[in-house]
């Protein structure tokens, strides 16, 4: 979609999916992208990867739900490793390059007596944004690292 307030919020309005189904929402721009707590996620229109996944991971024990955010961070790290060295993880869910944040993950789970009822897994990856204006302390994009823009769809 071109624009959403937040891809996580968009998926919150959907019904649960089957155990083997993942619903993905991708936006070119988020008017109210969120991070952990009260933090916002700054992103210029059409510059970064902004997506969320809705799943019902009943196979993940509630006590191990942190594994979902770790798996997401590892997947982003592996994708970025193909472009540059120095990509590291700040557990449980942030991806850094030389102490600068290039990606963040926001996991929102619903749990009932049987386990994890649903999970919305939001990821923001700074791809082509060259300037950041928020009060985020240390953002960086892949384009800043490489010195040129890259195709978001390839990442």
What is the predicted role of each segment?
Residues 58-63, 67-87, 97-155:
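Long, positively charged amphipathic alpha-helical accessory segments at protein N-termini or as interdomain linkers
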Residues 1-82, 149:
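N-terminal lobe of the biotin/lipoate ligase/transferase fold
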Residues 19-21, 91, 100:
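Short, basic and Ser/Thr-rich N-terminal targeting/leader segments
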Residues 27, 87-91:
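General beta-strand structural signal in soluble alpha/beta enzymes
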């Amino acid at each position: 979609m071109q624009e959403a307030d937040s891809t996580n919020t968009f998926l919150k309005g959907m019904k649960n999916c089957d155990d083997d189904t993942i619903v993905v929402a991708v936006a070119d721009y988020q008017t109210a992208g969120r991070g952990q707590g009260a933090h916002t996620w700054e992103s210029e229109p059409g510059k970064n990867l902004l997506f969320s996944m809705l799943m019902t991971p009943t196979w993940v024990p509630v006590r191990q739900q942190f594994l979902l955010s770790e798996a997401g961070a590892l997947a982003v790290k592996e994708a970025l490793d193909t472009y540059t060295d120095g990509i590291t993880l700040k557990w449980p869910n942030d991806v850094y390059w030389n102490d600068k944040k290039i990606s963040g993950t926001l996991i929102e789970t619903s749990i009932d007596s049987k386990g994890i009822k649903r999970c919305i897994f939001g990821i923001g990856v700074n791809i082509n944004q060259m300037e950041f204006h928020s009060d985020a302390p240390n953002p960086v994009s892949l384009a800043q690292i490489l010195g040129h823009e890259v195709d978001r769809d390839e990442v």
